[in-house]
Amino acid sequence: MNRFFAIVYLVVATAAIASAQPATPTPSPVDPCAALTTRATRAETRLRDWPALDRYREANSTTTPPTKDENRVVFMGDSITDSWDDPRYGGFFPGKPYIDRGISGQTTPQMLIRFRADVIALKPRLVVILAGTNDVAGNTGPTTLQAIEDNLASMFDLAHANGIRVVFASVLPVSDYEKTTDGQPIVRTKQRPPEQIAALNTWMKKYAAMHGGIYLDYFSAMADDKGFLREELSEDGLHPNQKGYEVMAPLAEQAITAALKSRS
């Protein structure tokens, strides 16, 4: 119990400091007490299980080995992958031997820690890695492009060492088009500068080409002439809506097909 109150105190103190800084408005107002409780609970969970290994532990334990001819694919990622199996978006590739292992809010160091349990142990033919946007935003603290690239390279190399082919998916564009319920702009590009996203995508494309992987370019298909996430593809300037996933799905299928046909 004392630990819980200590976490609450830490969250309150952090919130007080953050309130003095200009912040990106949230999409909708929330009850302060409920928000504080939620943040304290998340903080406690992160203390116990920072990489969220427990999230898929049970599901992994009941996942049977792939059949001889099964082209099993695991999707590793953050909220964009995590939300893909939401019924609102038509489900996660119905009828396909694809496994969703996305976790909302995660960064590449967290994914790297759980990569063996959530990808390698499931024995897929291929992994699709969509990661990096939360690193750029600093979800788990300050970082550098070099550190993000190192984590992505480590996941790539771990997969290859275990006979798993790799698709590197580009980080999606973001936009500043959306507004909160009280009309305030949601400025996504402040936390996720487009030039950093572009640099990371350029690196992934080059790394995949040099090491026998496939680069999946969501960015070009989803960006407008300003380089922003097209307004009709998102409700919050960050996450795809149904139309967004409808753009992404066939691109993912094309990349998977290409990767499975490759000899690397």
What is the meaning of each model-derived region?
Residues M1, P25, R42, R48, ...:
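Alpha-helical protein-protein interaction elements
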Residues M1-F75, T81-D82, D86, G91, ...:
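N-terminal secretory targeting modules
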Residues R48-L53, I103-T107, R192-P193:
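Short, flexible loop segments at the rims of nucleotide/cofactor-binding pockets, characterized by
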Residues V74, I99-D100:
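Soluble periplasmic/extracytoplasmic beta-strand elements of cell-envelope proteins
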Residues M76-G77, A169:
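Short hydrophobic segments within beta-strands
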Residues S79, G102:
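Catalytic nucleophile serine of serine hydrolases
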Residues S83, T107-T108:
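Short substrate-entry loop that stabilizes the transition state in hydrolases
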Residues G90-P97, Q106, L112-S264:
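Alpha-helical cap/lid subdomain in secreted, periplasmic
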